[in-house]
Amino acid sequence: MIVRTTTEITDTDRDITSEDGNWRSKRIVLGGDRVGFSFHETTIKAGSVNEFHYANHVEAVWLVEGTGKLIDLDNNKEYDLAPGSMYLLNGHERHRVEPDTQMRMLCVFNPPVTGREVHDENGVYPLVEVPA
């Protein structure tokens, strides 16, 4: 059994802030935990514009705090987000998140991220193998 708190993760190598400071992700469960997924708490700053494309991962996101917009860049659709909203990037959609207020979301990635990934110039996480 694994039990962790966000308090113990804060300011460790599991607590990642984007280079532009727009978002912060606390990686609660990572690939090294060997459970087949990773689980993160991500906070995105109000008024920021954030483009992502998880070409190698499926991501499920549940918004627990804040409001904003999700723009599906592949299908030219826009969605309002509020607490209780969930979106699933099961088609590896390129997307943009534009928070009106600070957004806090709980995210699940499959395959799991290892914690060493960095978004490339296209917003993509590379597929990093979990060492045996």
From Swiss-Prot:
The keyword Lyase applies. Pathway: Amine and polyamine biosynthesis; ectoine biosynthesis; L-ectoine from L-aspartate 4-semialdehyde: step 3/3. InterPro entries: Ectoine_synth, RmlC-like_jellyroll, RmlC_Cupin_sf. Signal peptide: none annotated. It is an enzyme of class 4 (lyase). It catalyses: (2S)-4-acetamido-2-aminobutanoate = L-ectoine + H2O. HAMAP family: Ectoine_synth. This is L-ectoine synthase. The lineage of its organism: Bacteria, Bacillati, Actinomycetota, Actinomycetes, Mycobacteriales.
